[in-house]
Regions:
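Conserved glycine-rich beta-strand-loop-beta hairpin in the small C-terminal domain of fold type I
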Residues: 298, 302, 317-328, 338-350, ...
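A short helix->loop->beta-strand "cap" motif at the edges of active sites that frequently abuts
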Residues: 123, 206-210, 237-238
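Helix C-cap/helix->beta junction micro-motif
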Residues: 31, 206-207, 334, 368
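Conserved core of the PLP fold type I
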Residues: 65-204, 218-233
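Conserved core segment of the aminotransferase class I/II
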Residues: 149, 232-318, 325, 329, ...
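N-terminal small-domain helix-loop-helix segment of the aminotransferase-like
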Residues: 2-106, 304-308, 410
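PLP-dependent enzyme catalytic core of the Aspartate aminotransferase-like
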Residues: 87, 91, 95, 354, ...
């Protein structure tokens, strides 16, 4: 009989959000007349903007004509989108990229999970705690995480982020090969300054580490002093891979498109000590395992960068951030300690009286019919917190805050 990859058996039986869905469904069955408002899973609610819809319709029409039909596209992505990415997302910030450093994908989740394939299985990893579960789970699958004991993986360096340090992780006192950073942060909604980010780049240069930088929420940054890209830091091209997504930027959760930057200067070593550029390695991996993002999705993404597209996408982002600002203010009125929600669509809320995350989740669900995400699902340091998202309708966010206030007796 064929042997299974036993590393998969180390994973928890349920993905965090699948577990939440089961609990919510059980509640709905028991309370069929009660409308549940979800501020948990971070899916968007607003429709695609008109510029994107127009571009998609045009692309569909092109697929209906033999002269303009498109089959397999280039694995890295079409030039029209990669050039638009460089021109709009990087050049205005003084970052110069070559088109061959841009890899279009079907959403950041794919590449953040798959990028570890091009690095040896015995590299050690460092993660902020709390953290987006995919970063660790994808490393568990390859055998890099070790053994799960007392809520932690034995071969993972956890870098706790809490209120005492504004949720900014401390630089490790030992060498870490692969470092996962996400800013604006999911789940805490906090950001990192250029000064703090520079410390990480310098650490990576000194220790020959690689930073895997998830910038999926950079479009929500409003503070001009906060970096949108790690490549705003001198030297980062030598040590960092950056991931971007259109899911929350432009509502592409159902369209699927994003991109990854792999600089040509970025290198890793063989066991013999030979330096090897990772850009062609990732390109080779993509050519083998990925047939490219759909033409229709890439035309949709290109439309985001038109004058009309920029204006419309910004309006949607502002819609969600209005929710975030409102929710933050209302929760603070209730005496809760709230973080995030200023440069990110996530709010990280301290539970009253240090109530365990899952217990508070259950109490809020049954007491207010409002769904949150238990902070402990993002790591040990998330215990005693919940995450709320601002991706709902204005009316739902308002009603959810009213329900929570009534439930808490405020």
């Amino acid at each position: 009989m064929a042997l299974v990859n036993e590393h998969f058996l180390k994973l928890a039986n349920n993905y965090l959000f699948a577990d939440i869905a089961k609990k919510v469904n059980a509640y709905k069955i028991a309370h069929p007349k009660q409308r549940v408002i979800s501020l948990g899973i971070g899916d968007v609610t607003q429709p695609l903007c008109p510029a994107v819809i127009k571009a998609m319709h045009k692309a569909v029409d092109e697929m209906a004509e033999q002269a303009s039909f498109r089959g397999y596209g280039p694995e890295r992505g079409y030039d029209f989108l990669r050039e638009a990415i460089i021109k709009n997302d990087f050049l205005p910030r003084g970052i110069h990229l070559d088109a061959n450093e841009v890899f279009v994908n079907d959403g950041a989740k794919s590449d953040t999970g798959n990028i570890q394939e091009i690095l040896r299985w015995d590299n050690n990893i460092g993660v902020t705690d709390p953290i987006y579960p995919v970063y660790i789970d994808s490393n568990v699958m390859i055998g890099r995480a070790g053994v799960f004991e007392n809520g932690k993986w034995s071969n993972v360096t956890y870098m706790p982020c809490d209120e005492s340090d504004d949720f900014i992780p401390q630089i490790p006192d030992h060498r870490v090969d692969m470092i996962y950073l996400c800013y604006p942060n999911n789940p805490t909604g906090t950001v990192i300054s250029k000064e703090e980010l520079r410390k990480w780049v310098n650490y990576a240069i000194k220790n020959e580490s690689i930073i895997l930088y998830d910038a999926a929420y950079e479009a929500y940054i409003t503070d001009p002093s906060i970096p949108h890209s790690i490549y705003e830091i001198r030297g980062a091209r030598k040590v960092a891979i950056e991931f971007h997504s259109y899911s929350k930027t432009a509502g592409f959760t159902g369209v699927r498109c994003g991109y990854t930057i792999v600089p040509k200067e970025l290198k890793a070593k063989t066991l013999a000590g030979e330096e090897v550029a990772l850009n062609p390695i990732w390109d080779r991996r993509q050519c083998t395992k990925f047939n490219g993002t759909s033409y229709i999705s890439q035309r949709a993404a290109e439309a985001i960068y038109t004058p009309e597209g920029k204006k419309q996408v910004k309006a949607t982002i502002n819609y969600y951030m209005e929710n975030a600002h409102f929710m933050r203010a209302e929760l603070q009125k209730l005496g809760l300690r709230v973080y995030g929600g200023e440069n990110a669509p996530y709010l990280w809320v301290k539970t009253p009286n240090n109530t365990p995350s899952w217990k508070f989740f259950e109490e809020m669900l049954y007491g207010a019919s409002v769904v949150c995400t238990p902070g402990v699902g993002f790591g040990p340091s998330g215990e005693g917190y919940i995450r709320l998202t601002a991706f709902g309708e204005h009316e739902d966010c308002k009603e959810a805050m009213e329900r929570i206030a009534k439930w808490l007796g405020k």
